[in-house]
């Protein structure tokens, strides 16, 4: 029984390493946050992932609730570190907006996502 213990431990460790090697970038934090209701328009969109992303192959698009593109083809830049990317925003009026993003994680996989936030008139 004890002779198999080192083999089982080695197998477990190999499986654990293999699972981590195929992990993709996961969105951990966003500014504005998903489903946020804001009373002041944000100045930028910042997306923070659990691992570094390739800024040159990443894009962020801002759309309104009529699917009109508000911001597109703006150069994405690193914000806080290699895990965070963002774009500056023009002055936004009240309404519902959708952040659509595509990033290339360091493992070579594309990750896409979309979320909304709302700007309410503060009058």
Language model feature labels by segment:
Residues 1-9:
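Bacterial N-terminal signal peptides that target proteins for export
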Residues 10-11, 21:
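Cleavable N-terminal signal peptides
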Residues 22-41:
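N-terminal edge beta-strand
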Residues 38-40, 44-51, 109-123:
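Extended, polar beta-sheet/loop recognition surfaces of beta-rich domains
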Residues 47-73:
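Short, surface-exposed alpha-helix to beta-strand junction/turn motifs within ectodomains of secreted
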Residues 80-86:
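Aromatic sugar-binding surface patches on proteins
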Residues 93-102, 113:
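A glycine-anchored, Pro-Gly-centered beta-turn/N-cap motif
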């Amino acid at each position: 029984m004890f002779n198999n213990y080192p083999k089982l431990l080695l197998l477990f460790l190999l499986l654990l390493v293999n699972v981590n090697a195929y992990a993709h970038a996961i969105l951990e934090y966003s500014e504005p946050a998903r489903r946020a209701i804001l009373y002041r328009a944000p100045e930028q969109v910042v997306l923070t992932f659990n691992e570094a992303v390739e800024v040159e192959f990443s894009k962020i698009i801002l759309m309104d609730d009529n699917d009109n593109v508000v911001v597109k083809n703006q150069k994405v830049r690193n914000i806080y570190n290699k895990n965070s990317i963002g774009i500056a925003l023009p002055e936004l009026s009240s309404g519902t907006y959708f952040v659509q993003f595509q990033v290339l994680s360091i493992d070579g996989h594309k990750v896409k996502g979309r979320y909304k936030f709302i700007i309410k008139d503060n009058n």
